[in-house]
Amino acid sequence: MTAKCVMVLGTTSGAGKSWLTTALCRHYARQGLKVAPFKAQNMSNNARVVAGGEIGSAQYFQALAARAVPDVRMNPLLLKPERDTHSQVVLMGQVDEALSRMPWRGRSASVWPVIHGALDQLMAENDVVVIEGAGSPAEINLASSDIVNMRVAQHAHAVCLLVTDIDRGGAFAHLYGTWALLPEHERGLIKGYVLNKFRGDASLLAPAPQMLQDLTGVPTVATLPMWWQHGLPEEDGVFDMTPTLATSCAALHPGEALAAWGGPAPLTHLRTVAVVAYPRISNLDEFQPLKNVPGVRLVWVRSPAQLAGLGADDWIVLPGSKNTSGDLAWLRTQGLDQAVTAHAARGGAVLGICGGLQMLGEALIDPHDIDGNAPGLGLLPLVTVFARDKTVRHTSAGFAALAAPWNKLSGLSVQGYEIHHGQTQQHAAMAAAGDVARAVMPDGLAWQNAAGNVLAVYLHGLFENPGVLQAIFGATTPTLDSVFDGLANFIEQHFEAGVLASLIV
């Protein structure tokens, strides 16, 4: 079996490559074909646990859309930024310290055999491989070391779509400029342009698509309407970033309801869930289901002013972090540490997840210089020591009896995943003095303070458990499967007739 390969390239980051790749995976899977996604290199702190290690979240969801088992070969190289000038390199699911220390240009030659080897295997096992590019294929300063865009396209003999975000303006210049900067032998791989996020009357685009085709020989094969709530989280950034607590996500997009996995929610709210968006936030996609919970408003905060209006029933969430000590220092610089502790002192609910759990303790100790030593926020009498080896695993566990306001989780079994270096335990001196945190999951996976309002868990994916949403909010959300079908329906409606079939002929 040698797969037909369809590749989604973009004129920029954020053009719509990831969700279009996901939609194509589900479309071809619905035709009865065996489908796999592939992205040679992904730079993201959003990762999921699969057999053999971790891959980018986007490829994980693309695999589910393809009705395939997620596999490290689908994203052989994952770069997880820790600082502005340094990333942790994950090769075939596992951290590679030597590659992490290597300059980027030197790294490319080393990893290319692994990348094309993974792609070759997927092509041999599937009918269709849907490949996602990264950034723009016309980054001419990077072309000599390319391992993710046109080099992959040529290796796979892929039929390429070039997608652009028309809502940003300059879409036709982006498309023409990208095509023009490619060498002639690479231009021929691009078989169609996709205009994404269009608002208004599509007839007003004329005569630009035909003029572009006259210049390049490439037709525009789809004009996709603006669709705020397609149901997938943004891959690279905080979705629906709100400037103030008073500005709801719905207000940013008039007429559009909040959505989690794609469904509607009312515009009124009973509880605000304020997630602190520090610079190295990780696994932010796990909060996507909260966007669809009736009565909940999910907001992202970066300053104390955004927390000024929180009430007793509102939550502050400290999410995961790829640089826990660095993000904790940023928290203090912003004054958010005082805002969090003040909310907790008033009895307000605080939830820490993974790196957020570590921040809530007394101290972070780093003997291997992974994240650096740092004092914690002191809301839980815990100490975290960063180990050299990373814990990467799926985990199922049950909550013990919990005090309010988290009591509705008592006895509930949940599934999730762990990705962390830290090992956390009680602060010995404080425990000896009677100041202890309650372990509310086995093996130190979750802790609660004596007052009950601060809960910390190592598990990512808490809100992806339907039982959690039902217990806390009395809510149900659409299934991922229905979201994937919605994506496929959308592109089937808006692509030109016959195009999707022609891509794999």
Language-model regions, residue ranges each:
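Glycine-rich SAM-binding Motif I of class I
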Residues: 358
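A conserved active-site-flanking secondary-structure segment within enzyme catalytic domains
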Residues: 361-416, 421-424
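Immediate flanking context of iron-sulfur cluster ligation sites
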Residues: 345
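Catalytic nucleophile serine of serine hydrolases
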Residues: 354-355
